[in-house]
Amino acid sequence: MELKVIDAKGQVSGSLSVSDALFAREYNEALVHQLVNAYLANARSGNRAQKTRAEVKHSTKKPWRQKGTGRARSGMTSSPLWRKGGRAFPNKPDENFTQKVNRKMYRAGMATILSQLARDERLFVIEALTAETPKTKVFAEQVKNLALEQVLFVTKRLDENVYLASRNLPNVLVLEAQQVDPYSLLRYKKVIITKDAVAQLEEQWV
């Protein structure tokens, strides 16, 4: 499998031979769906909560007598039937949303995503990703020269200047190879990987 190598202006300058096991795998939509769902579920903080009828601050006085008013019987205003009453089946912050994905599935999923990106010509290789100064304006110009709008950069080791210069750009994300996840790969229109990061990804996932 060959991946296109681009220069600083976004022009194709050559190609890089890569592992077929990682970049030429058949697409498995069901597996990708499961990986992304698990990633998003595991990212949940689980802090949502509502109150039960016992926890809502209301008077326990009976609103009106049981019989003779013609209205439906009612015990207290904290009932779930009442406006501003408690919830019948409230969410609690101790809910566990964790979904486990075994290593074999995760490797296969990452490989199928990278392979599809390569087939769709959304995946490119660049020699290196550096920034002389931690200036967002300068780095934004570099991204503009690459003719990219929404891009994920993957490097072997994150340069401090690159991190500082890119962190305030809304459509740019820079990750180290060991931090790459399925959701980020699919979220961005283009994925640019440095040559040394390609080697590390092959070492990790093949």
From Swiss-Prot:
InterPro entries per UniProt: Ribosomal_uL4, Ribosomal_uL4-like, Ribosomal_uL4_dom_sf
Any GO BP annotation: translation
Entry superkingdom: Bacteria
GO molecular function: rRNA binding; structural constituent of ribosome
Family: Belongs to the universal ribosomal protein uL4 family.
Function in brief: One of the primary rRNA binding proteins, this protein initially binds near the 5'-end of the 23S rRNA. It is important during the early stages of 50S assembly. It makes multiple contacts with different domains of the 23S rRNA in the assembled 50S subunit and ribosome. Forms part of the polypeptide exit tunnel.
Name of the featured protein: Large ribosomal subunit protein uL4
